[in-house]
């Protein structure tokens, strides 16, 4: 048993003693399992620290209590660990994937991703999962023997495949990737290190992915209430949240709205975690996987919402899309944020000398695609705050994003 390993694993869990290893071989740690080392490397990375000033929905300066990419990632990790513990999975690997899942996000949330994707359209586009892989495989410069974090194979496959297979066994893209193709960063990397894009990822990765959904649903409701984009009465339009609100009101008729909102978020998380756990138990009993590789060979994800809860969860996402993500206030700020990234990309492409010295290598290449990708990597690593400051340095007028 690896040093530092928690409770005994279920047979279908990823076993750190049987890890497929790292691209660059390293001697084992005397005090930590391979997956614990992965998690610690993510936590100590500069990319992880930068998440503190990256938008979840609201730009960092709009309020001190709104989620950022960092606080969101910590909340995803808490939910993921709880599920992993219940299912007998490796908590260290699960935590690694929960904390690493947003490392590739650019500043200004999904608006920033759309802006960079447009800027890089002629050069393979921008995909935050592919960018997370670039971060952990190349862009972090902390170790003398290798670029990136040199994570285990299991962590890398989880970062790339947590939402499911990208190809079939023949290598043909499936699902979303059938139309858009395999993101260039992933397609390039698997030539060096095969992540078996045709298979499902481990249960640890599947748990991290569904924990992300749960955290989004519950905590975006919390932030939306705090921002005044909607209120508790609006949330009664959905049967699940209406039932939780009604039960809370029955137990605590005089409770103020702030506490009722907090109780809604808490009960919603508990409800969704419980539903996922019950569905996972049912799926595991039906398929009887005896190893992590058995999990990868399945024809569907084993960690999922049951059908009725999946519809409840989809209704929450529809509500948030209409009342929060597409709210005119949010849309106005995100429109201005996209323009900031358009401006920065065009400026750096025309005048690479404006980049920091350490980023000039590659940005002055003769190949325009190489230059564009280098600039895209630089912008993707920016925080909201740095992007604003850099725009103010390079341009006469910069929106304040308020």
From Swiss-Prot:
It comes from Bradyrhizobium diazoefficiens (strain JCM 10833 / BCRC 13528 / IAM 13628 / NBRC 14792 / USDA 110). Keywords: Hydrolase. Pfam families: HD, HD_assoc. The keyword Hydrolase applies. PROSITE patterns: HD. GO terms for biological process: dGTP catabolic process. Residues 69-217 form the HD domain. Belongs to the dGTPase family. Type 2 subfamily. It comes from the Bacteria. This is Deoxyguanosinetriphosphate triphosphohydrolase-like protein.
């Amino acid at each position: 048993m690896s040093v530092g390993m928690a409770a005994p694993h279920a047979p279908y869990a990823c076993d750190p003693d049987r890890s497929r290893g790292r691209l660059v071989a390293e001697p084992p740690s005397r005090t930590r399992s391979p997956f614990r080392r992965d998690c610690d490397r993510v936590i100590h990375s500069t990319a992880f620290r930068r998440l503190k000033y990256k938008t979840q929905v609201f730009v960092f300066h709009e309020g001190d209590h709104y989620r950022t990419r960092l606080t969101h990632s910590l909340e995803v990790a808490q939910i993921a660990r709880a599920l992993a513990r219940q299912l007998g999975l490796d908590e260290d690997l699960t935590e690694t994937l929960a904390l690493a899942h947003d490392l590739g996000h650019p500043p200004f949330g999904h608006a920033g991703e759309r802006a960079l994707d447009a800027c890089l359209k002629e050069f393979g586009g921008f995909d935050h999962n592919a960018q997370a892989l670039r971060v952990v495989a190349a862009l972090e410069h902390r170790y003398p023997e290798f670029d990136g974090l040199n994570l285990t194979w299991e962590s890398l496959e989880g970062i790339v495949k947590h939402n499911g297979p990208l190809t079939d066994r023949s290598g043909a893209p499936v699902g979303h990737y059938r139309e858009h193709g395999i993101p260039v960063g992933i397609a390039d990397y698997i030539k060096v290190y095969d992540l078996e894009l045709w298979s499902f990822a481990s249960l640890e990765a599947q748990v991290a992915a569904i924990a992300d959904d749960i955290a989004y649903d519950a905590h975006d409701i919390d932030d939306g209430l705090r921002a005044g984009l909607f209120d508790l009465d609006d949330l009664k339009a959905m049967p699940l949240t209406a039932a939780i609100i009604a039960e809370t009101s029955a137990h605590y008729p005089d409770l103020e709205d702030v506490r009722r909102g907090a109780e809604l978020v808490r009960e919603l998380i508990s409800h969704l975690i419980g539903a996922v756990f019950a569905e996972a138990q049912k799926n595991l009993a039906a398929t009887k996987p005896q190893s992590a590789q058995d999990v990868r060979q399945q024809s569907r994800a084993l960690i999922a919402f049951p059908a009725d809860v999946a519809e409840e969860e989809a209704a929450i996402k529809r509500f948030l899309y209409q009342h929060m993500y597409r709210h005119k206030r949010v849309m106005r700020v995100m429109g201005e944020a996209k323009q900031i990234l358009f401006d920065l990309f065009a400026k750096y492409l025309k005048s690479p000398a404006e980049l920091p010295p350490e980023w000039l290598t590659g940005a002055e290449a003769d190949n325009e695609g190489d230059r564009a990708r280098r600039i895209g990597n630089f912008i993707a690593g920016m925080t909201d705050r740095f992007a604003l400051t850099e725009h103010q340095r390079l341009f006469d007028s910069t929106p304040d994003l308020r």
